[in-house]
Amino acid sequence: PTPVSALVHSATMVAAGVYLVGRFFPVLTPDVLLVIAYTGGLTLFIAATIAVTATDIKKVLAYSTVSQLGYMMLALGVGGWVAGLFHLITHAFFKSLLFLCSGSVIHACHTNDMRKMGGLLKVMPYTGWTMLIGCLAIIGAGVPFVLGFSGYYSKDAILAQALLFSRTNPQHSILYLAVAGGAFITAFYMFRLWFMTFAGSPRDQHVFEHAHESPRVMTRPLVALAVFAVAAGWALPGGLGVE
């Protein structure tokens, strides 16, 4: 069920490994952290490239989760304890939102295949706009020095830590390139998901004719999570001990 996927893929089971590494961070040696960083970089890149080719809406989000976990592991590996756990927290909000939005779409269309969707924003405005907010949050959209979505702050912290690590260890500059490149790929597959689902004209008229907005009991949680997907990053850095 999609609500279970939202819980499992955002902040519980899949995040346990990141949480464990974060707890053991003070006792890990530099060599071990370097292995963790490269493992995270490889994970985020491979999972992101798979998400680019997926046509099942839930599989795109599942591989997106794997990619974001790679980000967190890479952050921990390059010494960014705060950055890694900060991204873990912001990820919980926008990934829960994205999975629940996908569940709303599947509930309306009775299919997971994005190739049969298209134009759904006309009949599912609440789901469409809240999912766009989730997409903007996961790609780290924002205006530098002004305001950004929650992912903007956590991903920026990871980028800054990876850049600092690459400057002090030039032989490992590929880790920074992995973070930066992964951010571009993330933006591509998330916008691909949204445009294939909600924009353009319907590709399957039968699916479109039966599509409808979900009831309020399903859309209200989307709006609540959308608020946190936007604003979670505004307050959390101070709570983590970072001004």
Predicted segments, located by residue:
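Hydrophobic transmembrane alpha-helices and their helix-loop junctions in integral membrane proteins
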Residues: 1-213, 217, 221, 228-234
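Aromatic-capped, Gly/Pro-kinked transmembrane alpha-helices
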Residues: 227, 238-243
